[in-house]
């Protein structure tokens, strides 16, 4: 799914009502060209099953193609470190819709919470080796339920003030929607990029469209319109229900549940909305956790090139489980679960930091889409495509470069926290983690081909002897 209610809540928590302007900017100047580039790439490489790494292989070099594939896997490491947190929070609201249990979680010592998170992760790491197919069905149903609940919130949230006569944010004017373009604002851009990314998953469908040169861009523009409506109206609904001038400090952690709790209160339905949403989110988080462990690993290692990935990592047991791949996942994710708890003050700040880290790391994979598009424009005579986003190759290259540069800029700015004093010990600790995490994760990818070369040479020598 390209969109979720959490995107509205998290960005409202970052920017308040000024996020309305940001959404308009992002969708018009980033999401729409991004989606249409994906359409052209999907059309140009319609026979390719390898996704972004195949696009990169066709337009650049095999090594860069490997790094693209590695990036698509490794960005899931912070995601997997954060998912058990989200699962525990969703479960706490499902069990205690008053928020009492969620309050207990929020006050826990970060080391205690992260120990629980580590146990949950390791349990589901084991579960994912069993290939629980029913979870995918449950996850799809839960995801659809959450989407419907999100639309319901927008409609009922906008209507609530007409019933109660009360708007939480006082004196809303045009100025309420215009951000202050300072350093703090620039650090929030990565969360917006994180929210609208991922539409490259739609690329295979461009060739299933009748008259793709006309109908696919129309479909993408409809998708962009739907995202825009959800983002804009959802943000305004949040401003109706929450005071944008006094945003709760734990809105990222608990905001989705506060929103449905308030909605139930406004309509006299008690905890009904929050229970339904929490149950759906629990199932969705559980399913996402299991499948985000297994599926990306199979994509990376299932058809691995021995030039770039050591054969040992592709080793499977009798049940077809990528044993060493799972061990690598366990080590990387467990490290990212435990280490931050040693230097971040409280659980709410830890949750917010990990979510923001995802907004820095996850968009790194979008860079490869834009690089592939620039490569396609450089080699346009080599590839035939039924659909072209921009017919002028030089202009198309510049648009790809704009999206690439903006994504990189947003990721870099997202590394700097604004909720702690600059250059304080905790600020330095967080910035260090934000910088080192992507560097280490990408660095491992650069080291693997070297290890592969050495191990392959050793294998050949042992065979000769």
What spans do the regions from the language model cover?
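Hydrophobic transmembrane alpha-helices that form the core helical bundles
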Residues: 33-40, 44, 48-117, 126, ...
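Membrane-interface loop-to-helix entry segments
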Residues: 114-163, 197, 220-225, 355, ...
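Membrane-water interface regions at transmembrane-helix termini and the short interhelical loops
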Residues: 10, 43, 67, 119-142, ...
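Membrane-helix boundary/coupling elements in multi-pass transport proteins
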Residues: 71-87, 201-205, 268-311, 366, ...
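Transmembrane alpha-helical segments of multi-pass small-molecule transport proteins
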Residues: 95-131, 147-155, 192, 196, ...
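Helix-loop-helix junctions that connect adjacent transmembrane segments
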Residues: 20-21, 104-112, 140-275, 422-424
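TM-loop-TM module centered on a large, flexible mid-protein loop between adjacent transmembrane helices
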Residues: 54-55, 61, 225-290, 309-358
């Amino acid at each position: 799914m390209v969109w979720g209610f959490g995107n509205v809540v998290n960005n409202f928590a970052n920017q308040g009502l000024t996020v309305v302007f940001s959404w308009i900017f992002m969708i018009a100047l980033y999401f729409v060209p991004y989606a249409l580039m994906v359409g052209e790439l999907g059309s140009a490489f319609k026979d390719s099953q390898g996704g972004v790494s195949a696009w990169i292989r066709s337009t650049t070099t095999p090594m860069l193609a490997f790094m693209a594939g590695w990036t698509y896997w490794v960005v899931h490491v912070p995601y997997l470190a954060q998912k058990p947190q989200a699962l525990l929070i969703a479960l706490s609201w499902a069990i205690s819709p008053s928020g009492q249990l969620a309050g207990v979680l929020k006050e826990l010592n970060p080391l205690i919470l992260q120990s629980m998170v580590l146990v949950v992760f390791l349990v589901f790491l084991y579960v994912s080796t069993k290939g629980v197919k029913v979870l995918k069905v449950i996850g799809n149903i839960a995801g659809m339920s959450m989407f419907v609940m999100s639309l319901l919130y927008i409609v009922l949230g906008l209507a609530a003030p007409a019933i109660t006569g009360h708007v939480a944010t006082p004196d809303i004017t045009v100025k309420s929607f215009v951000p202050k373009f300072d350093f703090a604002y620039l650090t929030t851009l990565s969360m917006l990029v994180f929210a609208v990314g991922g539409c490259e998953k739609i690329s295979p469908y461009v060739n299933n469209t009748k008259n793709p040169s006309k109908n696919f861009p129309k479909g993408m523009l409809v998708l962009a319109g739907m995202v825009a409506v959800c983002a804009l109206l959802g943000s305004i609904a949040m401003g109706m229900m929450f005071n944008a001038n006094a945003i709760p400090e734990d809105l990222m952690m608990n905001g989705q549940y506060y929103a449905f709790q308030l909605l139930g209160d406004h309509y006299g339905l008690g905890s009904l909305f929050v229970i339904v949403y929490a149950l759906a989110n629990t199932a969705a988080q559980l399913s996402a956790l299991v499948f985000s462990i297994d599926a990306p690993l199979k994509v990376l290692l299932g058809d691995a090139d021995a030039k770039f990935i050591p054969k040992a990592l592709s080793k499977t047991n009798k049940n077809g489980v990528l044993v060493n791949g799972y061990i690598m996942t366990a080590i990387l994710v467990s490290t990212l679960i435990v280490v931050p708890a040693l230097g971040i003050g409280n659980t709410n700040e830890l949750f917010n930091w990990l979510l923001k880290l995802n907004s820095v790391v996850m968009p790194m994979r979008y860079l490869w889409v834009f690089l592939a598009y620039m490569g396609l424009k450089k080699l346009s005579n080599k590839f035939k495509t039924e659909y072209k986003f921009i017919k002028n190759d030089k202009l198309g290259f510049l648009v790809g470069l704009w999206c690439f540069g903006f994504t990189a800029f947003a990721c870099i700015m997202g590394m700097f926290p604004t909720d702690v004093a600059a250059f304080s010990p905790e600020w330095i600790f967080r910035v260090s983690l934000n910088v080192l995490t992507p560097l280490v994760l990408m660095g491992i990818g650069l080291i693997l081909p070297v290890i592969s070369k050495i191990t392959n040479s050793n294998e050949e020598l042992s065979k000769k002897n």
